[in-house]
């Protein structure tokens, strides 16, 4: 499969090839691992803002990208207006960058940890959260990806959690630098994504509990949990009060109070 993909990639344009790779991630679960192997070799890195500003790399308009209001009905979901709707990624991902985001999000829902790990590796190496390519995507697509990415903490797998933390906190090992990176690039999107999911009125108990479990799991990483608690805890309790139903009581009672106090 990998050899076939390599031959195909050499005969078509990059944008056409990668568009079909995103479709493979969405529609062909059994082919995700070969697709990820090919993407890991061929997908160019999309530099961070600092790297782009220092090198003067030009950006091209990205059709369908850029901030926009979403149909989620929350003014808080409107993105900051200082993100330029430009990115040098249209020739890679194609005109619909949202297709790339949806491909990543679909693969992150895969039951195989190897697939989830491969997507997180791609995100941390080629689509960093501080890159112009990521910030040029639609706000709704950013939220979609954030919801899918944060869901990996529910697997309780250290390799997945470590990659998630790296994407949210940046490449530095210094806690102060990580917190500064989180507040500048990740925190607001993380807050909005979790709050939107908390406010959804799902009929399924598992779906209603999911964002709260993610919130509690993220508290395990102090650099994330401390800042996230400051901006989300009141909204979380308000949403919990609205959405809690009798059949949820047993699940809530099993939550460790120490994790909340942390």
Map each language-model feature to its residues.
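Structural marker for long, regular alpha helices in very large eukaryotic proteins
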Residues: 1-27, 31-50, 58, 64-262
């Amino acid at each position: 499969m990998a050899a076939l993909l390599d031959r195909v990639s050499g005969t078509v344009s990059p944008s056409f090839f990668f568009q079909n790779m995103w479709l493979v991630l969405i529609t062909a679960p059994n082919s995700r691992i070969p697709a990820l192997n090919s993407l890991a070799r061929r997908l160019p890195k999309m530099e961070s803002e600092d790297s782009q500003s220092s090198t003067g790399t030009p950006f091209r308009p990205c059709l369908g990208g850029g901030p926009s209001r979403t149909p989620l009905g929350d003014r808080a979901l409107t993105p900051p207006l200082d993100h330029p709707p430009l990115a040098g990624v249209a020739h890679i991902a194609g005109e619909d960058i949202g297709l790339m985001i949806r491909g990543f999000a679909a693969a992150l829902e895969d039951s195989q940890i190897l697939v989830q790990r491969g997507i997180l590796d791609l995100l941390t190496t080629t689509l960093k959260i501080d890159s112009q390519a990521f910030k040029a995507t639609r706000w709704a697509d950013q939220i979609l990806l954030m919801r899918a990415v944060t869901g990996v903490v529910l697997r309780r797998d250290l390799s997945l959690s470590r990659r998630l933390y790296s994407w949210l906190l940046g490449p530095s090992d210094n806690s102060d630098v990580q917190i500064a990176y989180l507040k500048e690039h990740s925190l607001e999107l993380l807050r909005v994504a979790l709050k939107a999911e908390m406010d959804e009125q799902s009929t399924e108990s598992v779906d209603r509990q999911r964002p709260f479990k993610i919130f509690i799991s993220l508290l395990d990483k102090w650099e994330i949990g401390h800042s996230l608690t400051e901006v989300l805890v009141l909204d979380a309790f308000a949403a919990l009060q609205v959405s809690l139903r009798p059949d949820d009581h047993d699940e809530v009672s099993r939550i460790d109070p120490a994790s909340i106090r942390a």
